[in-house]
Structure formats: structure tokens, C-alpha cells
Amino acid sequence: MSIGILGTKLGMTQIFDEAGNAIPVTIIQAGPCPITQIKTTATDGYNAIQVGYRETKEKNLTKAQLGHLQKTNNSALRVLQEFSIESSDSIEVEKPITVELFNDNDIVNIQGYSIGRGFSGYQKRHNFARGPMSHGSKNHRLPGSIGAGSTPGRVYPGTRMAGRKGDSKITIRGLKIVKVDSERSLLIVKGSVPGKPGGLLTITQVKKV
């Protein structure tokens, strides 16, 4: 994973380009994310930085978590996440990760949790075709066969069935940053991102090959 920043989805709107075309964009409150730990190959076996996000009350954290954050003089932070790096020589604990990590027109990957839809049936969750809705049919929204009786005599693992829909980790790749607002720590990204307003997002740089 490339170095990135944590943020909060604020919502969607639209902006207009020079030709007057409407562009759908998502507004993201990104960072600042203080560095809470620097991991090196000498001490941990790999190079990475750990960053924090979303300040909270100390009573919401354990003593172990508070002690970990106090090592770098950070306040109580609800979210901690690691980003792998090639070298930690240029990383300073005193300098938090901000939106200045990105520039206009950069391409990024954004990860978040999709909106949870609760317990859903076959048609809504997996787009199954429904049965006839009239003429004496008793198979309106049933799943149909889920396996033979004697052989194999069981339901195969992974069979698509009714269950909880959504609330899964989703990564949208190749999104374009339209504008970086350093003063208000905002990223304006073209297109949609996972989750509902207020959801946690991870924005990472795309590795250049």
C-alpha cells in the first residue's frame, strides 16, 4: 500500500468545467493525520508509518492505547492505520500527514465501507430473477434449487443466498482529484466513493509503474 491519508466523506455535489459540463464530485474532509509510530526493518521487520485520525475522549480508549499515543505526544485518537513505505529516513513524527500530500489532477484509490442495507433477499442482494407473479404460481421470490438431495447431499459453501447486504470494504481505483483545498483540509474528487456521509475513508496514492 502506498502512503495515504484518512478522511471523512462529507457528501456529493457538482461543479462545472470551462465548457459548462456538470462534473459530479465528492467532498472529503482529509486529515490532518498525526504520525503515531514509525516502523523500521530493524525494529519491526518492515518499513511503515502509523497515523491516527478522529480525536476522541480519553475514556473511550484503553490504558494501553493511551500509552502508545503518549509516546509521540498525541492526543486520544479513535482510528489508527498503517501505510507501508520504502524508507523512513525522510519521515518526521512532528509533521502530520495533510492534504498537501496530493496535487490537483492526481489519481488516487479510495477505500471505505459500503452502505449497509440489512438482511436482504435473493433478488435484492444477488439480482436473481423472480418467479411468475400470477397464474397460480407459488414461487414468487424463492431461491429455487440450492443443491441435489443425495449427491452431494449438502449446500456448497459460497452459494448465493439471502443475508446481510452491504457494509463491506470497497476500494474504488483510479479516481481523479479535481481540487485540493489546503486551508480547509478538503479533497474534491471526481465521481462517487463508498459509504454514506460521515463514513471513514482511506485515500492512497496510485503507485506509478
Curated annotation (Swiss-Prot):
One of its GO terms (biological process) is translation. GO terms for cellular component: cyanelle; cytosolic large ribosomal subunit. Pfam families: Ribosomal_L3 (PF00297). GO terms for molecular function: rRNA binding; structural constituent of ribosome. One of the primary rRNA binding proteins, it binds directly near the 3'-end of the 23S rRNA, where it nucleates assembly of the 50S subunit. Its main location: plastid. SUPFAM superfamilies: Translation proteins. It comes from the Eukaryota. Coiled coil: none annotated. Belongs to the universal ribosomal protein uL3 family. Residues 132-154 are annotated as: Disordered. This is Large ribosomal subunit protein uL3c. Keywords: Cyanelle, Plastid, Ribonucleoprotein, Ribosomal protein, RNA-binding, rRNA-binding. Part of the 50S ribosomal subunit. The lineage of its organism: Eukaryota, Glaucocystophyceae, Cyanophoraceae, Cyanophora. It comes from Cyanophora paradoxa. It is found in: Plastid, Cyanelle. HAMAP family: Ribosomal_uL3_B.
